[in-house]
């Protein structure tokens, strides 16, 4: 070091990308990679634009054929310390420079697709509409209410993307697809809230005469 100090153990620095798995819907790729725990087909996963993870790595200047060279054998690491930005306003509001993580909120990722019936916005009476976007809006509000049941709890619920078909100002939405991100440090509570959300989706779609599909996005 600049001060002439020699550490008792070697210090290495590693940087992981997309650990939450947003792009290829399976996270912890880098950390699982250095542990030798990648699964078959990992490199063939595609993002929303059809680009494989393998191609993305190559475009970034990486050589996927050298992954094995990056593996750490069990027992070869004495300790691991992760430094991370907060990604939130809590420390700033509390005027604190640093915090120590005591738990991580595991995410539940869902994709919800609602289907109703399209029609002209000016001629279909409100009483007989099957508006998929109205149903989606009520489900989104329900998710927010579910996540806010216990004030101060680390539960968070987010709808980050929403797509409407046919997406025309004068046509009643026939189909809506949106994502759900539900997180909580307490896994039992998250499971309970997931059940509440499923019940809400069922009742809301019945009320608006909609059909629905739900897929859990692997992470």
Regions found by a protein language model. Name each.
Residues 192-202:
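Short amphipathic alpha-helices in soluble, non-transmembrane regions
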Residues 1, 13, 136:
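Short strand-loop-helix active-site module centered on a catalytic nucleophile
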Residues 19, 23-187:
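Midchain, well-structured core segments that form catalytic/ion-binding scaffolds
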Residues 2-10:
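Flexible, small-residue-rich helix->loop connector segments that border functional cores
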Residues 213-219:
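An extended, acidic, His-containing surface patch that forms the Zn2+-binding/catalytic region
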Residues 12-14, 213:
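A structural signal for isolated positions on well-ordered beta-strands in alpha/beta enzyme cores
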Residues 172-173, 208-210:
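Flexible hinge/switch segments at interdomain interfaces of large molecular machines
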């Amino acid at each position: 070091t600049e001060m002439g100090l020699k550490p008792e153990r070697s210090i290495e620095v590693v940087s992981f990308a997309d650990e939450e798995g947003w792009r290829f819907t399976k996270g912890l790729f880098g950390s699982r990679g250095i542990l030798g725990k990648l699964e078959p087909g990992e490199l063939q996963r595609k993002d929303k634009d059809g680009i494989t993870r393998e191609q993305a790595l190559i475009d970034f200047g990486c050589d996927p054929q050298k992954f094995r060279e990056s593996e750490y054998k069990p027992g070869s690491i004495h300790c691991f310390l992760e430094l991370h930005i907060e990604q939130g306003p809590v420390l700033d509001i509390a005027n604190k420079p640093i915090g120590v993580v005591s738990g991580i909120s595991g995410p539940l990722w869902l994709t919800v697709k609602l289907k109703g019936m399209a029609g002209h916005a000016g001629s279909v009476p409100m009483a007989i509409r099957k508006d998929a976007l109205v149903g989606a809006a009520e489900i989104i509000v329900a998710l927010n209410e579910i996540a806010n049941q216990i004030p101060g709890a680390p539960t968070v619920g987010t709808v980050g993307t929403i797509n409407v078909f046919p997406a025309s100002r004068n046509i009643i939405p026939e189909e809506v697809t949106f994502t759900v991100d539900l997180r909580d440090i307490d896994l039992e509570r998250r499971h309970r809230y997931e059940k509440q959300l499923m019940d809400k989706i069922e009742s809301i779609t019945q009320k608006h005469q909609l059909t629905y599909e739900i897929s859990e996005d692997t992470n």
